[in-house]
Amino acid sequence: QATAEGFRVAAHNPAIIGTLSITLVANMFFFTYAPLIPVFAEKVLGVGPTLMGLLGGAHGLGAFIGAGFIALQSKINKRSGYYYKGTLVALGGLFIFSLSQVYTLSFAALVIAGMGIAGFATMQPALIILSSDDATRGRILGIVSMTIGILPLSMVLVGGMAAILGPALAIGISSGVGVALTAILSFYAREMRKL
């Protein structure tokens, strides 16, 4: 009953719908690349375990830089800007990564992607808190957790696509679709963009 009430509240709040939609897109099309890093490093970039490990940490390095930048801001007027623009930067960086066959470019692209996803990750709960009341906030945050739960299924789908098309094309298609969907959703999520 509490969950159903949370869905009812979310369905009538355009700002929450926008936030949840972009959360769904990020978990379907961005985070799914991580299990493919070893395959990408070996088959596309032709590097060994050490450079593959560094490549796997590039996203985290970028996220650390991005989160630090946000933390240093004395005042943030448009939290939604960090959220949806950060998601676009993250998916755009991942798309560049999918096209790269040069290690340094691949590493840089993932650092940029990590910087973008920091905006998504830091502002996601903030937007939910700003657009919900005390009585329903916990339920709405529960729905956020449910949307994050799409990630394992998405990983299976992208992994299957990589088995057929190769890791680069699978990541490219996934991130490209993610960029398009995020741009469309951000355009229509006017109430979310006010936050």
Specify the residue positions occupied by each region the protein language model found.
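C-terminal transmembrane bundle of multi-pass solute transporters/carriers
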Residues: 4, 11, 25, 37-195
